[in-house]
Amino acid sequence: MSTLHNAYPDKSLYFTEQWIGAPANFAGDIKWHMREVIIGSMRNWSKIALEWNLASSPKLEPHTPGGCSNCLGAITIDVNKVTLNPGYYIIAHAAKHIRPGSVRIESGYSGNPDDLPNVAFLTPDNKVVILVLNNIDTKQIFNININGTIFTSELAAGEVATYVL
């Protein structure tokens, strides 16, 4: 996406859909989608990141003819029962604090950037929101530096967190 942005910097980029296959691997799906879809697309100039599809039945319906027949909805609706799936938590985690009008701001990590992928935003009410994923198999302790004020945090292996400062 950054290559496209660099070639056409005046054009807007939209990451419009990514699906989770059934059956879900909850921890693996959360980690991959937070890293690649939410953090990855936003760090590479996307104005949105959209998980697809929003809702499905236990039979993974409806879907368009020839469309994805094993796409798991963010929620599964079975008559009077609603099941929350990985897509729900991915969307909810990002959308709770990154509200419309938020703008991505620079963020980084002094170690291996693949170990602690992150993305930061400035919200319309002037708060800094940072999404961080511990992408390795051990606990990580790290610092968040906002204008010289340092906060220390830790994440267990595979854990994702949102910081609102």
Predicted features and spans:
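Substrate-binding and catalytic surfaces of secreted/luminal carbohydrate-active proteins
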Residues: 1-165
